[in-house]
Amino acid sequence: MRLQKVYDDEIGELCDTINYMSDEISRTERMKNDFISSVSHELRTPLTAIDGWSETLLTGGGTNPEEVRQGLEIIHKESRRLTRMVEELLDFARMESGRMKLEVETFDLEMELYEAVYMYENLLAGSGMTLAYHTEETELYFMNGDRHRMKQVFLNIIDNAAKYGKSGGRIEIDLRHADKDIVVCVRDFGAGIPEAELPFVKERFYKGSSKERGSGIGLSITDEIVKLHGGKLEIRSKQGEGTAVYVSVPAIDVHTALGVETSIAAEENVDESL
């Protein structure tokens, strides 16, 4: 329902504000309904594959060893996909209720990024898509935060790059220091994001005009995790050229970090000697 603006005074401004809020509520409600529909579809797809191949193998189908291996690979892949989707939904619930917490420690961010890259190198093997990873080998990238959550950030961003990147194309990942921050850039060379959609891509439930299906909450969760670390998630994109996602988080002094690492190692040695 919209209010009719009659006068250009304070009452008129109030009408404009109420109408804007009403439009936003309607837009969010539509996005939420689309989200529920998308999640239902996204859950059904891996479940169908798992159920179909499980039944085939249990009823004696796939007597050829290669076919059995293929079936088991599909079950494994779809199970992991399903697990990630459920974890994403749980994270969204925690985020909405303000219960998303960090297990803070001092750690080397490069190790978490490298593990995420290594995982996707294996997942993309045979797809024709390649990952190019670059960092300064002499640099150290220590920070205070939740190592598992930061790895989740990188997995989500690389997953998006693989999903929206050009088939058989390239994903570039760069790690560097910028002032007092650590900056990670993940770049694909796919279709890119329309300029009109860029302001909304981090909103919950937002999916844009892409034909790729998804829950519409992955990027909003990623953004929230980065914010909890005192960092910033920035997206730059140009249609027809691709998308670059920048993650900036506060670095800590290398000497401080190494002091913490040494202290932890010393405590572990004392515990072992007791």
Locate each region found by the language model.
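Short conserved segment of the HATPase_c
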Residues: 193-205
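Membrane-proximal coiled-coil signaling linkers
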Residues: 25-66, 70-74
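Short alpha-helical segment of the dimerization/phosphotransfer core of two-component systems
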Residues: 74-82
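A conserved beta-strand-to-alpha-helix junction within the catalytic ATP-binding
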Residues: 12, 103-121, 131
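Conserved micro-motifs of the catalytic ATP-binding
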Residues: 97-102, 140-145
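HAMP signal relay modules and closely related sensory coiled-coil linkers
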Residues: 1-20
